[in-house]
Every structure is written in structure tokens, then in C-alpha cells.
Amino acid sequence: MKKVWMVAAATSVVLGLSAQDSGVETQGIGVVIDAHALVDVVNDEIVFDFSADDPTEAGAAFALGTNKDQNTHLNYSLMLSNGGLADGTISVRISDMNEGMHMTLLADGTPAGTLDPNAYGKLGTVAANFDATLTTTGVKLTNADQILIENIGSSYTGDGAGNGYQLLYTAHIDDYSKLDADNGAQDMGTITYTITE
């Protein structure tokens, strides 16, 4: 019985010594951030209203007036899941455009370019062919995805009008013979923006 008691006492002393605090302590911490990719256009719908552009003289053509140009802003939030490689993109495509017409697009990244990268992250750059600071010729939108913004890192643009990237749309007539009147209704097309990494 004495031997069992001595072993128990020795074990208690050793365990007691190893559980004591010291002058230095470390603690592990964990951080969990979910990857996310969100994109938004400030106006869910833009209407190109040409009802005031009817010709007033017989033999004159219907021509698109000042409403052929519209603009809005694109906002996004992106948290990369690939170790921080700034390879995010936003692509654009169009579907169901009015027959006889097409849409061109330019983007101005100046508002996003003024944001502090320490606060907003690694914001993307407008692809050169879409960049309104480099060209005045818009890119014709098609039903195939085209890269609009590239090299996006973990970042966000701010929300609402005046934040992010200004989008500059222009409507054009392709084939006059395919145009038709809507008599107060509107043909609806869809422009789709997709953010990926």
C-alpha cells in the first residue's frame, strides 16, 4: 500500500509542476473568412426611350437621339479563395437585343482608381478595349462573355451611384429593315455581368 501511495504522490507532484503558469504564455487563434463574389449594377433597368425621335417630314429617317447614350455604375465585392492571386474578372454579355440594333459599352475606372488600396483592396483594371480613358469607340456587346474588368484582388468598390466603375452604353442601328415600333411597350434585352476568380 505504501508503494501505491508513493507512486500516486510522485505523479501528483509531476502533474502539478507541469500545469503551473510561466512568465510567457502563447495562445493559438484562428480566423475564418468565407470567399465571396458579388456584382451589382446600380440601375436594374435602363430604358432607351426613342419615342421623341420620330421623323417630322415624309421621307426622313428615324434616327436615334440623345437618349442613345445612357450610363450607370458597376459595384462589386470579391474575397479570393486562391491565396491572394489577383486574377478575378468581371465579364459582360448581352441577350435579346432589339432586332436591327446593337449596344456598345465603355467603362471608366477612374472612380475606383482613386480608392486607397489599404482600405479597399486590390481593385481591378478596365480591359484596354473597354477603357473609356483610352478610347471613345465602344465595344459591341454580343451573347459571348467578354472580359470587362481584370486583375481583381480581394477588394470592394463601395455601393451605389458614383462608386466603382462607370458604365457608358450607346445604342446603335444595325439594320433599319429589322426595326419595329413598340407602340408604348418596350422590347427587353438583358445585359449580364459575371464576376469570377
What residue ranges belong to the model's regions?
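Sec-dependent signal peptide recognition
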Residues: 2-8
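Hydrophobic h-region of N-terminal signal peptides that target proteins for export
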Residues: 10-18
